[in-house]
């Protein structure tokens, strides 16, 4: 439901509320839980105040809440009849609460428009899920005979609280400087704080329960959420969770923060009615700090990574006529570095702990990614604007490309860097209105990519195939 209210000639608002509630259309046959259900509440209000003929202020807020059992993700070897039914030994849960408040102020200065944008957002998520996606111990008939051995694994819970503040101010020209230069200048700031917790349990001895208990400094996890009441072990006291005697896996408490600011500017030089030269630059300073406490003190790190970079773009556009344009561009791009939640032990640390010695492949921090991009193309409209064709060719050269990597040490993986790689290709797009009832949408692309430098990484498929059943 929505309502628009014009309070006066200068003040108006629009408010919307949406409620969704439905039973699940999938079922966990082991515990009877309905999955793919929905219990959502959404609220948004948007207010516009005309301060004067040349200035305005817009303020908006949004709230969203979800309290569901979670999605039905059926294991690959789950033989439960009916694609909407599965057998898993976890009572899953998905909860999300999101709040957003923002404002936009616009002020016409005559020669330019000044715009200020600010926002605050807070998201809280809480998830309980079955990580092995099967039920080999409690319902072996639901798992195919050809399946590999599955140890019971679940996250109970995985939670995160994320709070982000942003502010941006920019100025956009209303009329070309000296009659030929359009321009924009601005600055951006972001501050983000995250608190994350993960509790993973493993049925390592394959007896159907997570043996033992221990005190959790952060969670009073409800063991009754894990299994039907008939399977609950007795004697659990408040503040204790299962997982002693080796039946707990990845445990993490992490507190990353990010602070980023940048300044930027761009101008378009109108050389003639047909030719334009576009040039822009941006300077970014990005700092990540993270306190990581994994395995309740087994791996502790105070991590920090600062990335600074100046990027830019130079482009040429030439109108072949009223309906066609050719262009070329040279662009420098940048993705800041950061810190990892988990990372490998050094060879010295492996030796001191009596582990098999292997070089670390995932490090506490990772480097910034940068790209040098070249592109040429043509954009054309035909048949009185009823047909549009875009064709482009491109070449990208990456330094320190970021990718998701796995470390030889167990429970450790994160982002690593490929020192050098290249990507090139071409793409074409045709969109047309053939008749009042029929449209055409055609897209095609060819792509060739290559890693141009040597680096060490772990083949996950080969590594996993060497893990024996207990």
Go through each PLM region and give its residues:
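Transmembrane beta-barrel architecture of outer-membrane proteins
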Residues: 1, 20, 38-42, 93-100, ...
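Transmembrane beta-barrel wall of Gram-negative outer-membrane proteins
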Residues: 1-22, 26, 30-69, 96-102, ...
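Transmembrane beta-strands of outer-membrane beta-barrel pores
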Residues: 19-23, 63-67, 109, 120-124, ...
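Solvent-exposed loop segments that connect transmembrane elements
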Residues: 26-34, 71-89, 130-156, 199-251, ...
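Short sequence motifs at beta-strands and strand-loop junctions characteristic
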Residues: 35-39, 51, 93-97, 159-163, ...
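Structural signature of Gram-negative outer-membrane beta-barrels, strongest in the C-terminal barrel
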Residues: 48-54, 172-174, 186-190, 254-396
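Face-selective signature of the C-terminal outer-membrane beta-barrel domain
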Residues: 97-124, 153-292, 319-321, 383, ...
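Gram-negative outer-membrane beta-barrel transporters
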Residues: 172-174, 186, 273-277, 392-397, ...
